[in-house]
Regions:
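Conserved catalytic core of two-component sensor histidine kinases, primarily the HATPase_c ATP-binding
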Residues: 60, 185, 194-195
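Short, hydrophobic secondary-structure boundary micro-motifs
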Residues: 72, 187-190, 218
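Glycine-rich "substrate-gating" loop/helix at the edge of Rossmann-like oxidoreductase active sites
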Residues: 129, 160-170, 190-201
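Alpha-helical substrate-binding/gating segment
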Residues: 177-186, 199-210
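A glycine/serine/threonine-rich, flexible loop-to-helix segment
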Residues: 116-118, 169-177
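Residue-level detector of conserved catalytic or cofactor/ligand-binding positions
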Residues: 208-218
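N-terminal Rossmann-like NAD(P)+-binding domain of SDR-like oxidoreductases, especially those catalyzing
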Residues: 1-162, 202-210
Length: 218
């Protein structure tokens, strides 16, 4: 059974989930991951044994204007989920057996690449350059700390830019498409020399599912 928890901030839209809302193995819950007591209650109510954590503030420009909300959601929200999972799983009959906290991060925690053919690996030193990437780096460290300190089974993966249907139009690809459709100018960031990798949402979702199933052995 899948419990989909979302605060439904400005970029959220329940209409995107119309085709699955009536499925018997799916439940939507409108809640804030920073609401610790509510998260604890949900773990108890639904006997949650696995978390795939994608909830985050993710727009770099917005993080520059208001870094506090990024620290609150991305760092404290992640800590709220981790602590709720710890309390629920440590006291269960099977402990951490067949439990998993899967945390989706970003390649932005590694900083920027030069045009010299180098690339990031999971061993690359963290060098976040924006409040957004700094908040995600902080959440990554908390996830790994819960593994090292309490033995919680975790995965951390680092995605590049995602795109796909229904994406909020502040993101680059839907922004470009909308501007082209309406005859508006296309924005140029910096000197226009930035290079980005893009991952289609279906491929990303399949990868997350496979990683989760393999690690959790569910």
């Amino acid at each position: 059974h899948i419990i989909n928890l979302d605060k439904l901030t400005y970029a959220g839209n329940l209409a995107n989930l119309k085709d699955i809302e009536g499925q018997p193995n799916y439940t939507f819950v409108k809640a804030d991951i920073c609401d610790f007591e509510r998260i604890i209650q949900l773990f108890k109510q639904y006997n949650i044994d696995s978390v795939i954590h994608l909830a985050a503030e993710s727009h770099v420009d917005r993080s520059i204007k208001d870094p506090f909300i990024f620290a609150q959601t991305n760092v404290m929200g992640t800590l709220s989920l981790l602590q709720a999972a710890k309390l629920a799983w440590e006291t269960s009959e099977t402990g951490y057996d067949h439990k998993l906290f899967y945390h989706i991060s970003t390649d932005e925690v590694y900083g920027a690449l030069d045009f010299d053919g180098t690339f990031f690996t999971e061993q690359t030193k963290y060098q976040p350059h924006s409040p957004y990437s700094a908040s995600k780096a902080g959440s990554d460290h908390f996830v790994r700390a819960f593994h090292d300190t309490y033995g919680m089974p975790v995965i951390v993966t680092n995605c590049s830019n995602n795109y796909g249907p229904y994406q909020f139009p502040e993101k680059l690809i839907p922004l470009f498409i909308n501007n082209i459709r309406h005859g508006k100018a296309l924005p140029v960031y910096g000197k226009g020399e930035n290079v980005r990798d893009w991952l289609y949402v279906v491929a990303v979702s399949y990868t997350h599912l496979r990683a989760h199933e393999t690690k959790a052995n569910l």
